[in-house]
A protein has these predicted regions:
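Structured secondary-structure scaffolds
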Residues: 1-193
Length: 193
């Protein structure tokens, strides 16, 4: 299956100052939080967010950032137990990535390594899809500005600066991801050249 971020479904995380859905949060952030230089940048990104469909997060390629999840064998995506949600499994994956990098996901025996002793590895399929590169790029705000001694206190960038092509790319993906995880834009200003 493909993996989507539903941008019109309520996020349900109590970060509703700018709206309940990713789309509402993004459009309100564009209007109420961000200074646009030039001003036409606001209209460009706003119209893209206003008209966009749900975000397809997955890609079927041999390289990229793996999605690192397991699905129940034979289950449908609509089944409650389709996706394995287990903190101990997630901790094993995170530890492997910290010590070995993303290639740990593709190593021989990875499924057993991550699942054995917690759940029956035979009951789950390892997902080999990767994230859309714009999802990967859009996550930079979380690692550059948050959870670091030299990051900003509120985790927001003062300015994103790129060419106008990034309205469809980095500005767009950063906005959607931050609105989904933090409730608002990751930047105070956007300047395009």
């Amino acid at each position: 299956p493909q993996w989507f971020a539903a941008i019109d479904r309520p996020v349900g995380d109590d970060q509703d100052k700018f709206g309940k859905t990713i789309r509402e949060r993004a459009m309100n952030s564009i209007d109420k939080m961000v200074e646009w230089t030039p001003k036409t940048g606001r209209n460009r990104l706003y119209s893209m967010i206003e008209a966009r469909p749900d975000w397809v997060l997955s890609r079927q390629r041999a390289w990229g950032v793996p999605m690192t999840c397991f699905t129940k064998t034979g289950a449908k995506p609509t089944d409650q137990d389709f996706l394995l949600r287990n903190g101990e499994v997630n901790a094993r994956i995170a530890a492997a990535f910290e010590s070995e990098g993303a290639d740990a996901w593709y190593a021989e025996g990875a499924k057993n390594r991550f699942l054995d002793g917690i759940v029956d590895p035979e009951a789950y399929d390892q997902v080999f899809d990767i994230f859309d590169v714009w999802f990967d790029s859009g996550s930079t705000h979380a690692f550059v500005l948050r959870d670091r001694d030299d990051g900003s206190e509120d985790g927001m960038a003062d300015l994103y600066l790129e060419g106008t092509d990034q309205h469809r790319g980095w500005f767009h993906s950063s906005l959607l991801q931050s609105c989904g995880t933090r409730g608002h834009a990751p930047y105070r200003g956007v300047l395009t050249h």
